[in-house]
A protein has these predicted regions:
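Metal-dependent amide/peptide-bond hydrolase catalytic core
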Residues: 1, 169-274
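Short glycine/proline-enriched loop/turn "hinge" motifs that connect secondary-structure elements
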Residues: 71, 159-165, 228-230
Length: 274
């Protein structure tokens, strides 16, 4: 397999979360070129070793196809792969196109020989936004998995633990009024104290593997007119949780300490480790 050329093709295809169809097509075509009939559900693509034996343990090789959107700081065309000083630049080259092509190459090397295990190679979708049409859509189709190797940019160091993720949407309430008069209650000012709490609060238990719980306010929205005191201020918080807390624990602490309404998007992505 020409891994570098395949990675260049992947980079040339925009594959933002939920829009991985064309790069998934490329994956299917690549497997066909190498003699494998890929299975597909949505934009998730996978193959199994030919002599699959359900009695043997099964190893999953997985990396995701989707990327985030490029920000404004790119100095190169994010969709044109460029090799400089032995490094390949392009959107998704590191997270995780490089892992995709490496996993595929490893599968082809190993699956052609008799092994004491089965192999499944998966190119998954919607990882960056934990979308419902990603790996959770198809994990039941893969059969029993005894060990999974997940491709992520970890500096070539094996990662054995992962922080949990909880995103919360917060709404600070005020009262509308005219900005020219001493009217209303400014919801932005009400939100400020809660935002400061998220910035400064420290959870007591620090993990030797995963470090501290980290809370980051990543978006804020309020007001539509310059002369109207806003009645609502909405902000969202990205929370990364170590193994000493569940997402429910974190939520209860937040709820006790802030005045804003707090709505978790999900409690399901707790920290995990092996």
């Amino acid at each position: 397999m020409e891994t570098i050329e395949l990675l260049k093709k992947m980079i040339s295809i925009p594959s933002f979360c939920g829009n991985e169809e064309r790069v998934a097509d490329l994956m299917v075509a690549t497997w066909v070129e190498h003699g494998y009939s890929a299975e597909r559900s949505g934009n998730n693509v996978w193959v199994k070793s030919r002599n699959f034996d359900p009695v043997k343990p099964t190893i999953l090789l997985d990396a995701h196809l989707d990327t985030v959107r490029p920000n404004g700081n790119w100095e190169k065309d994010p969709f044109t792969a460029v090799v400089e000083d032995g490094k390949l630049y392009g959107l998704g080259s590191n997270d995780t196109g490089g892992s995709v092509v490496a996993m595929m190459a490893a599968f082809l090397q190993l699956a052609e020989k008799k092994q004491a295990y089965n192999l499944v190679c998966l190119e998954s979708a919607e990882e960056e936004n934990t979308g419902k049409n990603g790996i959770q859509r198809i994990v039941g189709n893969l059969g029993k998995i005894d060990l999974a190797l997940i491709g992520e940019p970890t500096g070539m160091q094996a990662a054995i633990a992962e922080k949990g993720l909880m995103v919360v949407d917060c709404v600070a309430k005020g009262k509308s009024g005219h900005a020219a008069r001493n009217e209303g209650l400014n919801a932005i000012y009400e939100a400020i104290s809660d935002i400061e709490w998220f910035r400064s609060y420290r959870f007591g238990k620090e993990s030797p593997l995963l470090g501290k719980v980290k809370m980051t306010v990543t978006g804020i929205e309020a007001g539509t007119l310059h002369n109207v005191v806003p009645a609502e201020c909405r902000f969202m918080v990205d929370i990364r949780v170590n193994e000493y807390y569940t997402n429910s624990d974190i939520y209860e602490t937040i709820r006790r300490n802030v005045k804003s309404e707090v709505r978790p998007r999900s409690f399901s992505l707790n920290s995990s480790a092996i």
